[in-house]
């Protein structure tokens, strides 16, 4: 689609410096850059056996054209390795398309930062990141359920 390449380049060249600077004002429990293990691979490294994550699929930022590429099976071998590594610990709601699943396993060379923030500070931290031009979204962490991570759509 028109503008997809420009959007991808802008995303890949956005430095994580501002987000890192903002994070110094909050109680951060963990942080990782989302790179070769994809979003779900890195998330799985940040949480332990006592907790799980719940992600609202609508809130996941996706570059224009990425879903279409995945629908056309323009997939990477690394995404398949990531799926093989953590896929059995992820539960996707039945309405999540395969293309979105693939994007969450897809390795990124510059996928931004994933922070674990004290719950009471999460909203303020997110607003500050977004106010600085960031593309922050929230992942809900809860007591461990059946899977490491559930991808779905929260009720609106």
Where are these regions (language model features)?
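Helix-biased detector of long, well-ordered alpha-helical tracts
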Residues: 1-156
């Amino acid at each position: 689609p028109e503008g997809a390449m420009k959007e991808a380049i802008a995303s890949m060249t956005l430095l994580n410096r501002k987000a890192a600077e903002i994070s110094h004002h909050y109680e951060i429990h963990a942080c990782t850059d989302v790179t070769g293990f994809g979003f779900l691979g890195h998330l799985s490294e940040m949480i332990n056996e006592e907790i799980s994550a719940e992600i609202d699929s609508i809130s996941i930022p996706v570059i224009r054209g990425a879903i279409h590429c995945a629908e056309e099976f323009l997939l990477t071998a690394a995404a398949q390795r990531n799926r093989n590594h953590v896929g059995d610990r992820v539960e996707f709601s039945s309405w999540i398309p395969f293309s979105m699943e693939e994007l969450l396993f897809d390795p990124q060379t510059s996928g931004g930062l994933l922070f674990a923030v004290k719950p009471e500070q999460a909203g303020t931290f997110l607003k500050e990141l977004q106010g600085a031009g960031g593309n922050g979204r929230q992942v809900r962490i809860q007591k461990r359920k059946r899977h490491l991570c559930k991808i779905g759509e929260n009720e609106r």
